[in-house]
Amino acid sequence: MTGQRIGYIRVSTFDQNPERQLEGVKVDRAFSDKASGKDVKRPQLEALISFARTGDTVVVHSMDRLARNLDDLRRIVQTLTQRGVHIEFVKEHLSFTGEDSPMANLMLSVMGAFAEFERALIRERQREGIALAKQRGAYRGRKKSLSSERIAELRQRVEAGEQKTKLAREFGISRETLYQYLRTDQ
């Protein structure tokens, strides 16, 4: 019995077109995430892993869409193939079944290392671009989530003993952001 063909799509930004990744590829069902490849805790990836069954084939445009880190890529591929799920990477023309040859494992490692290297280059270019923009005065960073008045209110309520987790939720910020506001001088 042959299983389903399941597509996985990941885009990093909301302005990227997810449909083009598996254009012309027939799938029975598709899972799509809008998240960075560095994070493996992606809701639709986790749903796909739970959904896939023995005999199914997961189809992904390219390895870097599944993971940008070699260890994460290997782990995801191994998790799926150990359950009898096949994986196809369209761009690289590679398939993995769990009964792979040493050559197939080498290709996974090499191509995964390229994806990881590409991520490092992207981060480096981003840092350089931000540094240049700061020198020109064009980069100001992200806009603060709270106004000065709201930060003052937040501090007063923390000093009054209110729970920080509850306040973070009420103010619509993460706990880490709350702690950053408490650490910085106004």
From Swiss-Prot:
Name of the molecule in the record: Transposon Tn21 resolvase
Role according to the record: Resolvase catalyzes the resolution (a site-specific recombination) of the cointegrated replicon to yield the final transposition products.
Signal sequence bounds: none
Keyword set, alphabetical order: DNA integration, DNA recombination, DNA-binding, Transposable element
Family (UniProt): Belongs to the site-specific recombinase resolvase family.
Additional observations: Tn21 is a transposon encoding resistance to sulfonamide, streptomycin, and mercuric ion.
Gene that encodes it: tnpR
Any one Gene Ontology BP term: DNA integration
GO molecular function: DNA binding; DNA strand exchange activity
Pfam family, one: HTH_7
Native source species: Escherichia coli
Domain Resolvase/invertase-type recombinase catalytic positions: 4-137
Active site: 12
Highest taxon, organism lineage: Bacteria
Record-annotated DNA-binding residue ranges: 164-183
